[in-house]
Amino acid sequence: MIDGAMQDFQLTLDRFLDHAAKWHPDAEVVSARDDGTVGRINYAELHRRARLVSAALDTLNIKTGDRVATLAWNTQEHVEAWYGIMGMGAVCHTLNPRLTAEQLGWMIGQSEASILLASSDLLDLAREVIGSSTNGVCRLIALGPVKDDNDSLDDLLGQPSQEIAWGGFDETLPSGLCFTSGTTGAPKGVTYTHRGNYLHTLKLLQADVTSITAREVVMPVVPMFHANAWGLPFACPAVGAKLVLPGRYADGASLARFIANESVTIAVGVPTVWLGLMDHLDANGIELPSLKRIMVGGAPMSQALMDRIEQRGIEVQTTWGMTELSPLGTATPPGAEARDPRTSGRPAVGVDLRLTDDEGNPLDVQREVEGHLWVRGAAVVDRYFGQEQLATADGWFNTGDLARIERDGTVLITGRSKDLIKSGGEWINPTEIETVISALPCVSQSAVIGRSDPKWGERPLLLVELRDGYSPTDAELLAELDGRVASWWIPDQVVRLPQMPLAPTGKIDKLRLRNEYCNA
């Protein structure tokens, strides 16, 4: 036996805030408030307050592994609660305020959360959530000041009898719970672990992934209730980057003002967010000189939108991932030449990919072919909350995406297997049609779904949201597909929508579109 060993240093998430408080104590966390003011604290103060949250939860009899739900936007108070819950070994179950009370009530019934921490502006919704849930033991506590007699977390912080309950537990314990968006079916719970989130954070910080350093000012527009804001509230304190939290407002005007005022250098979110920002900048002749890079994921970005952003000297960094991956799987490296916006870069270290056939068998050739994308890694889901084994025995998880891996290892997401349209026994890939149509200057957003057809089984239906000032005919829109896709792929009909329906994630809500138009 070789003498000597490395220390047993548990990879738990409280260590990121410990590190920030010790080595980057003055780096700022800035938060937009509903009243138009801006809250500012530093990592030293965030660390102090998060530890007090842990102590308060301990006095409320929250134990290791207990679920505590949050109903809040990206704010300072939410980050404090988030770290306070995870820092004492409890599980932070983040809820999406854009869902209905019934949907959220079902979720806290599933998780059996014993406390719901809600932003002051969301207390009415929170009461409805608890009232509609089968969870009869969930206690409501407000984040921030309240005007009624509702319990407030602020009143529970720093009581003399409290002892700090912080860290000192096993890295394999669960840290968080996020439910998938449910845009194509019932939401499923994904349980994160401290070890998985810690390793995911190290993956994010690689030079060829986010390349975030203490010199950056980072604004995650993606909410904390979507896969932990893609892990950025862990990554920023880990390196001492200034963290800018936009609160509830993600409209173009609000984001432009916040980016300018706080000199944001990196902003992160789904394509619809950046569409709104570009429209606002164009309409008002505004420039954002501090903004160097936009990271995009969650849904495909059109070539037209990518071009609009890059014409302003802002780099677009495309990524691919999903809730089940914590969420990042691949990323184009910062500074890479602009390519097809569907290109999502290479997998980061700790992520393994493979392509399979329809039956799940690995393809003999893994380059320059299309297949079903499977993934495994330290931050990849093994099974959904309350369900049996999901991944294969050797750890492979079926993402549901179709992909092509190029010769150089970059990944091109070509569609979703559940979105494929079967017409006359042959498959049509809606993503290829959407890519062509969304690149047109007249189109703001587009979606293609399968519609029932008595002869062919299904036929593609094109739905578009046009940009203001444009009125192309159906024939003009469909003519753009000639020679770009097979002739029998061209949709038979075009439906114009005043506004494309979006899921709470900011993605196009194809489930709603199918429900409304599939049999029309």
PLM regions with names:
Residues D18, T59-L60, G87-D155, A165, ...:
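Structural core segment of the AMP-binding/adenylate-forming
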Residues L57-I62, S161-T172, L177-M219, G231, ...:
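Conserved adenylate-forming
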Residues A238, V264-V268, D279-R339, D352, ...:
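Gly/Ser/Thr-rich phosphate-binding loop
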Residues V29-T75, V79-Y83, T100-G105, D154:
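Conserved AMP-binding/adenylate-forming core of the ANL superfamily
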Residues T330, R346-G350, N361-D394, E426-I428:
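Conserved ATP/PPi-binding loop(s) of AMP-dependent carboxylate-activating enzymes
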Residues L99, L116-A118, R257, G377, ...:
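AMP-binding/adenylate-forming catalytic core of the ANL superfamily
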Residues D352-W374, R407-D408, Y470-D474, D509:
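Conserved beta-loop-beta connector loops within the AMP-binding
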Residues Y198-V217, A227-T265, H280:
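Conserved AMP-binding/adenylation subdomain of ANL enzymes
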